[in-house]
Design a protein with these regions (language model features):
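Membrane-interface interhelical connector segments
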Residues: 67-85
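Transmembrane alpha-helix/helix-exit interface in multi-pass inner-membrane proteins
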Residues: 52-72
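Hydrophobic alpha-helical transmembrane segments of multi-pass membrane proteins
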Residues: 14, 94-101, 129
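Hydrophobic, aromatic-rich membrane-embedded alpha-helical segments
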Residues: 125-148
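N-terminal signal-anchor/start-transfer transmembrane helix
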Residues: 17-37
């Protein structure tokens, strides 16, 4: 059975499941941000446990085929080295899983933080959708909204 699971989860299948798997979490964050569903499933450890497991599985699969993990550090040497790394599908999956997990974490943080200031959930849908698509810009939008609701600018919380 383990062999069947291993052979089923190819890189393309993992990519599909990771992309589809986060959609319910984002739906809950956007539509039901203050519900128990959001607290239990999205802003808890649950989605990150799943994404972390997928991350470990990708790393394990990479290790089995002899992936050069030391080469990952060359991404800091320049854009040409980063481009070379993105030619490898395993590296793209490691990067993409990381990106999906971080964006979901930021979305959960935005929801929890917006509740402190009683920001309208309809208004919060905009930065959450943008965070899902383009993480840093959604966070930037949220901070602009937060400044108006908090009526102050704080460098730390």
């Amino acid at each position: 059975m383990i062999e069947q699971i291993y052979t089923y989860f190819t890189i393309e299948t993992l990519y599909m499941w990771i992309n589809l798997g986060v959609l319910p979490f984002w739906f809950i964050l956007i539509v039901f941000p203050q519900s128990h569903l959001s607290r239990i499933f999205v802003t808890s450890i649950f989605p990150f446990f799943i994404l972390g497991g997928a991350y470990v599985f990708i790393l394990y699969k990479s290790y089995l085929i002899g992936y050069d993990f030391d080469g990952n550090f060359s991404l800091y040497l320049g854009l040409s080295e980063l481009s070379r790394l993105f030619e490898d599908h395993l590296y793209i999956m490691i990067f993409w899983t990381h990106f999906i997990a971080i964006n979901l974490f930021i979305g959960g943080w935005i929801v929890k933080d917006s509740q402190k200031f009683a920001i309208n959930k309809v208004l919060m849908a905009v930065p959450l959708i943008v965070t899902y698509l383009i993480g840093p810009i959604g966070l930037f939008l949220y901070w602009i909204i937060r400044i108006f609701y908090a009526k102050r600018i704080s460098l730390y919380d």
